[in-house]
Amino acid sequence: MENKKSLLKKLLKTNLLPLAFLGDSVHTLIVRENSLLKDDVKMASYNSFSSSKCKAQNQAFALKQIIDRLNEDELEIVRRARNAKPKHHAKNSTSADYSFATAYEALIGYLYLKEDQDRLIEFLNSSLE
């Protein structure tokens, strides 16, 4: 299996939707892990919390909250991912929210493969607030 750095290099040369796919998985994992840290919560509440935090609207909002803190490389990832043309979008979101959510997920995937844990945690925490 390729290491993270070489995979990142490969993905940056192409469409960023695979990076968003990875970022969505990372985001979902952290959200679910965070929900388990809450005391005495029923399973239905875990699912409800996770579902609410993983919606396109929440991810779009999170990106808008952090956009002023992004460096040039991160802004380029966001720009390219927003301009990507997915074949569909979530039925419960607008195409604008879906576009921003895709950009947020691509950014998370980028930071994960880049192994920039500090930035990754900083930005993931913004989506949990």
Where are these predicted regions, by residue range?
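Double-stranded RNA-binding/processing signature
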Residues: 1-129
